[in-house]
A protein has these predicted regions:
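Residues forming the flavin
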Residues: 1-53, 57-166, 170-539
Length: 539
């Protein structure tokens, strides 16, 4: 195949215009037959209001007699080159016999993709998920948003699909992976029902509504491959002798302290499994604090963001615009946007009684009237006194319990202008909030320390110079966003094992990922490490 980069066309272009551009760049005869596939598509707004789409495409000629090398040479363009797609391959089995099925704790993206690769290699893992399957989980979450009645075992954080199931469903990642794992993740989502556009969009997005369907289809496939799923069941203990795993113990409403004998356990816990973190710490796992960030969800009218980013009022051909903003200050604080949701909702994503935490969520169509993003301030171990590996967890809990008190269990909100003036908000400004979960006006001042709060205000002011209106007085703040990433890391060696033989920390909760795709990739890497070491010899 031939790859062409940097094909630039107006956003209003037709499919025929793209085809003509390919013919021109390859200097082909108009009668030469070929097919093409879009590899990457991104919006170029650097000359707004003139907007362009930039493409990379893979071209295959109908007539194999035409030499691709000769065509590339004739094109005489650095954007035209020979292309060979990287095909992902599962590694060969190792030599150590594994006669007991591996256990995966957690059915988020890390756990699901670890199970997917292990199943394809014949390992038939047992997946233990503390929350419910996605069909029941969706009902539990909706009930919580409508009534405020929380199910601590099945909520926005816990359940099949992980926390990302109730998010924007962004699939972009900064992970550079030459082995084809990133492509495999996207292709797998498409295989189970996602829009094929995620394979080439520069900022792929699946949406919480579509992602739920994809997860169900993926689970059904894995069950057919011999994977066992156990829902509403928590891994509550590990039997460890001489630094080696012997058994996993689980707890559920119907069966407490049930034993599963195994030599391999993947800890794909997610970032909110605080009781499990406690258990692992007390069991002697090597763990450490790590930096993370906290802040508030900030809402603006989506139309305002579109006009700033596109330079024109958005037309029907353009999707709701995302944004990404960052700043750094002399005090060492970074302030930046996180999990930006165009056309999205602020959601109550609490998972613990008497704690309130928020996140952002979008459906596939991104059709709400507001844009929202977490605007967060960096937190380092020095902010919470890192006397042990769980200090960051305790800091999160402190913020969430105080946040709960401010809103009396509802999402506390304050307009940015009132936040700056340390004043209680009494009414929305020119636009109202788009939320899933009930809200109340409350003061958010003092939740963060003075240095962090000042950094947040300065960050908002700076972002107002980048996006007109970002620091408008009626921007809506919702408190608090505390679970941007895991506050700890469970250490592992080059073979992905912890200091306990047979236990593999994995994904976001273990401190090795940040988002759906990077967590899925880490799950694949851990599965590969297990496959390279063992061969399945169980019945």
């Amino acid at each position: 195949m031939i790859k062409i980069n940097q094909i630039k066309l107006p956003v209003t272009h037709s499919d025929e215009a793209l085809k003509k551009k390919i013919i021109k760049m390859l200097k082909l005869n108009a009668k030469t037959g070929f097919t093409y596939r879009i590899l990457k598509k991104s919006l170029d707004a650097r000359k707004k209001p003139e907007l362009f789409y930039t493409y990379s495409v893979a071209v295959e000629l109908d007539d194999t007699k035409n030499s691709e090398a000769a065509i590339v040479k004739r094109a005489n363009c650095s954007s035209v080159l020979i292309y060979k797609e990287k095909e992902y391959r599962i590694p060969a089995h190792g030599n150590i016999s594994l006669d007991r099925r591996p256990v995966i704790a957690g059915a988020g993206p890390a756990g699901l993709f670890c199970a997917y690769i292990l199943a394809e290699a014949g390992f038939r893992p047992i997946v233990i998920e503390r929350g419910s399957r996605v069909e029941k989980r969706t009902c539990d979450v909706q009930k919580f948003w409508e009534s405020g009645i929380l199910n601590p075992k099945s909520n926005v954080q816990f359940g099949e699909g992980g926390a990302g199931t109730f998010s924007d469903g962004k699939l972009n990642t900064s992970v550079k992976d030459p082995s084809g794992r990133n492509r495999l993740v996207l292709e797998t989502f498409v295989r189970f029902g996602a829009d094929p556009s995620i394979l080439y969009d520069n900022k792929p997005h699946i949406g919480t509504d579509v992602l739920s369907e994809v997860i169900v289809n993926m689970r059904k496939f894995l069950v057919d491959k011999g994977v066992t799923f156990v829902f509403d069941t928590c891994v509550n203990n590990l039997d460890i002798v001489s630094q080696k795993l012997l058994s996993v113990y689980t707890d559920s409403d119907s069966n407490s302290n049930s034993e599963i004998k195994t030599d391999v356990c993947v800890l794909a816990l997610g970032h909110s499994a605080r009781d499990t973190f406690d258990m692992l710490y007390n069991k002697g796992f090597d763990m450490e604090c790590k930096s993370f960030a906290v802040g508030f969800r900030v809402e603006h009218p989506q139309r305002m963001i579109d006009e700033s980013q596109y330079g024109i009022q958005k037309k029907i051909i353009l999707p709701p615009s995302p944004y990404k903003v960052t700043s750094n200050f002399p005090n060492g604080r970074g302030v930046y946007s996180f999990c930006m949701c165009p056309g999205g909702y602020v959601v109550n994503s609490s998972s613990t009684e008497n704690h309130t935490v928020v996140n952002g969520m979008s459906y596939h169509d991104r059709n709400s009237k507001n844009a929202n993003s977490a605007i967060i301030v960096s937190v380092s171990p020095k902010d919470f006194g890192a006397d042990d590996a769980l200090a960051g967890v305790r800091y999160q809990e402190k913020l969430e319990t105080e946040n709960y008190k401010r809103g009396n269990g509802l999402i506390p909100q304050q307009l940015f202008g009132d936040f700056c003036d340390d004043r209680l908000t009494t009414a929305y400004g020119d636009f109202s909030s788009c939320t899933k979960g009930n809200t109340v006006f409350a003061k958010l001042n003092g939740l963060m320390n003075a240095d962090m709060e000042q950094s947040f205000k300065l960050g908002m002011e700076h972002f107002g110079h980048l996006i007109h209106g970002f620091d408008r007085k009626d921007a809506i703040l919702s408190g608090m966003e505390t679970r941007t990433s895991s506050p700890l890391r469970i250490k592992r060696d080059e073979s992905f094992e912890s200091n306990i033989s047979g236990v593999y920390p994995c994904g976001e909760g273990a401190g090795y990922a940040g988002g759906i795709t990077s967590a899925a990739i880490d799950g694949i890497k851990v599965a590969e490490a297990i496959i390279k070491k063992y061969r399945p010899d169980f019945k």
